[in-house]
Amino acid sequence: MDLKTAVFNAARDGKLRLLSKLLENKAKDDVVLLMSEKTNGATPLLMAARYGHLDMVDYLLDQCSASVEIGGSVNFDGETIEGAPPLWAASAAGHLKVVRSLLVHGASVNNTTLTNSTPLRAACFDGHLEIVKYLVEHKADLEVANRHGHTCLMISCYKGHKEIAQFLLEKGADVNRKSVKGNTALHDCAESGSLEIMQMLLKYGARMEKDGYGMTPLLSASVTGHTNIVDFLTQNPQTSKNERINALELLGATFVDKKRDLLGALKYWKRAMDMRHSDRTNIVSKPEPQTLIMAYDYAREVNTAEELDNLIADPDEMRMQALLIRERILGPSHPDTSYYIRYRGAVYADSGNFKRCINLWKYALDMQQNNLDPLSPMTASSLLSFAELFSFMLQDRAKGLLGTTVTFDDLMGILCKSVMEIDRAVKQTAPPPDQVQLNKALSIILHLICLLEKVPCSPDQDHFKKQNIYRFLKLHPKGKNNFSPLHLAVDKNTTCVGRYPVCKFPSFQVTAILLECGADVNVRDAEQNSPLHVAALNNHPDIMNLLVKSGAHFDSTNSHNQTACDLLDEKEMAKNLIQPINHTTLQCLAARVIVKHNIQYKQEIPEKLESFVLLHR
């Protein structure tokens, strides 16, 4: 074990005697350097503070001149916090004495993590009241919010820490501050079921505001299923009749899909129905639907107490009611609307009703693409779910275990929607598309193409498929490392796109159809690797031969001056199956000589040949 690791382990484990022995006779500059070096993303002081070793913290600061501010990576409850200063780690872990020591040694009380979380927020999160008080006494700013605009008061409310919330309010915390998404502390109480804190916030002048999705705290409580909050707020005289009705109906939908309590749902729907009909001269009717939705099996919302009573005999109809109610009240842009449509579809798939699942998922996907930004993680998740479902259906069909077939139209429809998502993304210039999400979307498309190759189709369908693949390639999308779709098709890492296996890559079939549809065989990635280079790295001679037959230049070099043949593994059979001499022309040999001897060639030979020589650099 090297000295750096030994020092790190000793600091983490609080072994002061061992640490002092390790640093014995070391030059001061060497010790200071050791204090700033990181193991697994953390300095020795950060680890000592995280685990509450006060004597170690004091020793590192006083004797080793450790920096009191250098942040690093620390783990709390399975989550890695990046850029956490020692004071943040000690505050989060509840080590008051260490917090005192760090502040005495000059730690900045408002120094934040990479997500802009302060030590005060860390203490509020885990309910360390004494540390909260101590930090505030030492000028901690109550109003510094994290990157989501979430304040110390908000997190205290969400986590149900009443005493901390009360202390912050007494110290002047802004009770009506809004997060980036428009949440207030009242929303956090509603989402966590913290009724006592909510009542306290109202005494301090908290207002019932809507968030970015148009959600009031009352609706937030309905979505999360906190009946205590819903009951309290529906009795509030300031809550309108319509708001009460919507809250009770939405709570019923939550009981169906989240709590799986159909009788509980009926109870709240009956209360709402009674409220709708409480004034015979002014019945509050539900809006008439413009169209009935095929994905919901053409269900319509019940309008009378009698219709509601009849639901008890039809659980499936109740589940459709829940989806209809949620979409009406929350609207299509709220994440819960599409989430529970997808959830219901998954339940159908688990019971073998794949057609209902596909219809619901298609409806949810349309909703997401119409309302979310391009390459939203939620949309990508929907597309991936389709790929996984179709893969499962094809496998079970092949084994003779499944009566339902995957149709060309189903698969092709999702491929078209996936290509549309890429089209939306590449047209978005500000901000540019997220490379990780774009790479994932490209990989999903290749998996869908792979699955399509397993489904029989007519000549017209085959033409339509190739038309769409051509349109996809003409968008010239580039994923991580500037990979083109052809690079991804010949890379084994494309296999790992989700939790469940879909298709295996490199894929000869996908490579072949991409080439047939016009993929550039000599396109380069960020390191000037062609698809041939990537195929060589993956030791796939069949695909390499296919690429060469399609015009791939065999001895072109990447930015490390390597040809594809140089990248083949000596231990693999592929090296023996690829014969460079069969693919090397006299023109190639001449270009290599020009490059090797640095012979002037620009403006001496035709422009076409200049680009040819460049391939051999």
Swiss-Prot record:
For this record, an example GO cellular component is: Cul2-RING ubiquitin ligase complex
Biological or metabolic pathway of the protein: Protein modification; protein ubiquitination
What family does this belong to?
Belongs to the fem-1 family.
One MF term in the entry's GO annotations: ubiquitin-like ligase-substrate adaptor activity
Described function: Substrate-recognition component of a Cul2-RING (CRL2) E3 ubiquitin-protein ligase complex of the DesCEND (destruction via C-end degrons) pathway, which recognizes a C-degron located at the extreme C terminus of target proteins, leading to their ubiquitination and degradation. The C-degron recognized by the DesCEND pathway is usually a motif of less than ten residues and can be present in full-length proteins, truncated proteins or proteolytically cleaved forms.
Print the domain comment field: The first seven ANK repeats at the N-terminus (1-242) are essnetial for recognition of Lys/Arg-Xaa-Arg and -Lys/Arg-Xaa-Xaa-Arg C-degrons.
Q: Which organism is it from?
A: Xenopus laevis (African clawed frog)
| GO biological process terms held by the UniProt record | proteasome-mediated ubiquitin-dependent protein catabolic process; protein ubiquitination; ubiquitin-dependent protein catabolic process via the C-end degron rule pathway
Highest taxon of the lineage:
Eukaryota
The UniProt entry annotates ANK repeats at: 2-31, 40-70, 82-111, 115-144, 148-177, 181-210, 213-242, 481-523, 527-556
One matching Pfam family is: Ank_2
Provide the gene name from the record.
fem1c
Q: Which UniProt keywords apply?
A: ANK repeat, Repeat, TPR repeat, Ubl conjugation pathway
How it assembles, according to the record, is: Component of a CRL2 E3 ubiquitin-protein ligase complex, also named ECS (Elongin BC-CUL2/5-SOCS-box protein) complex.
Q: What is this protein called?
A: Protein fem-1 homolog C
The TPR repeat units are at: 245-279, 338-371
InterPro entries in the cross-refs: Ankyrin_rpt, Ankyrin_rpt-contain_sf, TPR-like_helical_dom_sf
